Amino acid sequence: MGITHEFHIFLVDENVSLKSVSLLKGDSYGCNIHLKNSECKYITFILVLEPDWSEIAEAKPIRIRLNGKKMRTQLLTKTLMSIIYKAVIYVEENALVQFYSDTDRLYTDMYPTFLIDMDKQHYHILDNGYTYTYIDSFISECDKQRYLTSDIGENGYEDSTEEEDNEEDTDGVCLYCLEEEEEEDEDEDEDEDEDEEE
């Protein structure tokens, strides 16, 4: 059968759920999220891993990069059923957020990719990768009670994945939403030139 973890991501402030983000098979989990945003704001992510312990003794930590730069994830709670992390980022404009347990492209190329337009409240799956992922435009009451209650994190974990990530920062990051806007601007300029010629 192979290893089948469950991995879900909740954008708390946007009330959005990214469900079944984990690979169909394999000891790896992560995704790419393109954030389309026109104002400065903090964004809170709750990351829920439900490990398949059948073939592993320890779950890999979840790491995060914002526009290629390493950020901190806080371990809130760890039980037999689930491992819950929290990540808070500050964005001033469009951004790329990457969650990952591995850096090997054998795995990361199979991660799903999402576009979250916070201005228009539109949410899209750009690439399913090797997953059955889907988006809920809300966080269910069941998930709120299981993962977002105030007593989550009372164990006092201070663990962070920031120091464990020894990979170099990447400067060349491709932003889907930025490229899309640039293409639209170029099309508008061409239309204006044609109107002037007429």
Curated annotation (Swiss-Prot):
GO biological process, any: viral process
Organism of provenance: Rabbit fibroma virus (strain Kasza)
Superkingdom to which the source organism belongs: Viruses
Family: Belongs to the poxviridae C7 protein family.
Protein known as: Probable host range protein 2-3
Role noted for this protein: Plays a role for multiplication of the virus in different cell types.
Lineage per the UniProt record: Viruses, Varidnaviria, Bamfordvirae, Nucleocytoviricota, Pokkesviricetes
Region described as Disordered: 153-198
Acidic residues bias spans: 156-171, 178-198
